[in-house]
Amino acid sequence: MLLRLYPRPCRTIGINAVAHLHSRVSRRSYAVVASSPQEKNRNTVFDEETDVLIVGSGGAGLAAALRCSALSLRSLVVEKSDKIGGTTALSGGGLWIPNNLYGKARGDNDSIENALTYMNHCIGNAGPAASPERRMAYLENGPRMLEFLKEQGFQGRASGQFPNYYPQLPGGDVPRTVEGVVFNARKIGSWSKLVRQGPLSSMPPVYTDEVGKLYRSATSLSDMISAAKIVGARGFGRKLMGQVPVTLGKGLICQLLYLNLKWKFNIWRESPLMDLIVEDGKVVGALINRGGEKPVRVRARRGVLLVAGGFARNEEMRKQYHESPTTSKWTSAHEGDMGDVIQIGSGVDAQLALMDDAWWGPSVIDPVTGQPFFLLIERALPHSIIVDSSGKRFMNEAECYNSAGQLMYRRHRDVPAIPAWIILDSNHRKRYPFTTMPPRFTPKSALKSGFIVQSNTLEDLANQIGVNAQNLNDTVQRFGDMARRGVDEDFGRGDNVYDQFFGDPKVKPNGSLGPIEKAPFYAVKVWPGDLGTKGGLLTDENAQVIGKSGKPIPGLYAAGNTTASVMGRSYPGPGATLGPAMTFSFIAVNHIAKNNI
C-alpha cells in the first residue's frame, strides 16, 4: 500500500536528444553562465529553485539527498542518463568505514587512531587531496554517516572477515567493510526498472565476502553448501515468496532509493549539467538540460554538490592525463563516466589533483561483447601466474588489484607488459570458474575468438602468444617448486590473509599457490583496467571545492570520483571508493546546513 504513495518515475525523451541539444546550444551564449568565480552577475533569472542541487545519482548523490531531507533542506538530484545509480550500481557495493557500528556490534577492536595509523602507512604523502585534515574528517564522519543511515532505516552488515588490502601493515588487521543486507527491490515498485544494470546484476543475492565461496563450490563441500544456500534459500526461496532479492551495488542503490522515497524525493533523469552559474564569486546554481528538451536555470540557494563520477570513459581526457597505453575500453565504469562535471568544475577555476591515477585492476576483454571483466579472484587462485612479454613474473598476482594495475604500468616502462598474460593449467580450469566460463568447460567460441589460447605444451603456448618459451618454462618450473614448498620467494604471494581470502584452502601448503603442471595449458591477455578514475576536483575537509586561489569556492561542493581521492594513490580496503564518496557527500550537506553561505 505504501508504494502507491510514491511518485512514478517521470518519462522523458531519449538521451540522444540531450546530446543533440547540447551540441546546438552554446553554453557561453547564456549571459548567466560565468566562466570564472570572479565574474559577477546579479541579474540571473532562474526557472527553478531548490536548497541543494545534487549532480549525480550514485551512492554519494542518494546519500546526500537523504541527508538533505533529514535536515529539512530541499534537494534536487539531476542525472544525465536515463538510469539511476551510476557506477555504484555496477559495483560490489561495499563501504570501507573504519570504527563502524556493525564492526563494533560483533566485537571488532577498532578505533580512529588505529585506522589512521593504517591509512597513513597505505597513503603516505599524496598531496592535499589526502591531507591530514581530510583523512581525519573521513574517519570521524564515516561512522556518523552509517549511524545516520541506520536511523533512516538502512539495513547493513559487516562484510564477514573480508580483510583490508594490506593487512600486514600496522593497523591493518581489523576488517572494516560494510554492505547492505539483501533488499527486496519490489519495495520500490517501478523505480527498480530505472536502476542501472551491469554484469553483477545477474548474480544470485551474494554478499561481497561470499563471492569466493561461489568460485570454490566445485572443490569444497562446505563452499558447495554455502553456494546452494545463496542460490537456493536466499535467491529462489525469496523469489517464491514474491520478492526480488538484490545485493551488492544494485542492492545499495535500491535501498537508498527506498529510503529517499519515504521523503519528498526530486530527481530529473536525462538532465545533464551544462554549466555552473556564478554570482559575485559564489556558485548560486546551474544550467541543466532538463529531459533533453530545454536549458533550465536552477537556483541552488544553499549549494551545489557535484557527485557525478570521473572520466574513465573519456578517451581524450585519458590520453591527456594517463600514462600510455590507455583506453576507455578497459574500464568497468559505466558508459556515462565522461568527466564532463570535472571539466565544468575546472571552468570555474577549481583546482585538479591526481588526474593521472585511477582505481586500477587487471582485466580481460570479452571478444564478443567487448566488455572488460575485472580479475578479482581468478589471479589469486592456485595453478595460475601472470607473466610479461618476456615470459617472466613481475608481481604477486594475488595482491590488491589497484597495486597489481600499477605494477603492470611500472613493468611496462622496462619490459612490455601491456598486455600481460595470465597462464593457467588444467587443474585451474577443472576446479574454478574463469570469468564467465564454469569449471571443466572452455567453450569452443572462446578458443576460436582468441580470447583464450590453449596448448598441450608450454613451449607451443609460448610460441602462440609470442613470449620467450625458455623463460616461460623456467618461470613455471620455479613457481612450481615454490608452490610445493608453500612460499613465494620472489614476490610473497600467499603470505597474508588478503592473498589467502580468495585462494583455495583445500590446496596445501599455501592456498594461493599451486604448480602449473597439468596439460593442456591456457593463456589469456590481461590489461590494466580500472573501476573508475581517481583524480578530479580538489576538495577540503568540508567537501568544498578549492579554487586556484587556494580558497574554497563558495557554494560549490564535490565528492566521489568527481574529486581527487582522500586515499591518494592507494586502495586500503574493499569499499575505499564508495565509503569516502558517501561520507564526503554527508559532510557536504552537514556543512551546507550549518553555514548560510
Residue ranges and their predicted role:
Residues 1-17:
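N-terminal chloroplast transit peptides
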Residues 8-10, 21-23, 38, 164, ...:
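Generic low-complexity segments that are intrinsically disordered, proline-rich and/or Lys/Arg-biased
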Residues 22-113, 176-179, 183, 189-597:
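Residues forming the flavin
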Residues 102-106, 110-193, 197, 201:
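Dinucleotide-binding Rossmann-like beta1-alpha1 core, especially the glycine-rich loop
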